[in-house]
Amino acid sequence: MKRPQRLAEGDLAAVLSAGGHAFVSSCSAESQVLAAEVAGAGDALGDRIFSGIFIAGLNRQVCAAGANGRTVTFFQTPELKAQGQRNRFLPLCYGDSVRWYAANPPDAVLLMVSPPDDTGMCSFG
């Protein structure tokens, strides 16, 4: 198992390859810091897809980088709808979204956790 990697500001483009698929912590665990890092990485991330459980009225950040970045969402938000073709809306219930992730596994997961302990374990709070 790969150990968690702590990122400093501006490191995202160096650790995420262009293209691919990243799950982004969202819903009530949205990180404005991560969304800003994705936006700041810009075109260096190519046509990378960012997916998550984005909720209207709660998640106002658009997690897409550069001109070719795309988002997949299971709940449509006004901010994502405004992205037009860059946003793929899949109106699935939670159970079906789990199956979608099983069929479309991300190659990266972006979330905030506590620093790892001596064994490399992290906590969500």
Please give the residue ranges for each predicted region:
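Conserved alpha/beta enzyme-core scaffold
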Residues: 1-125
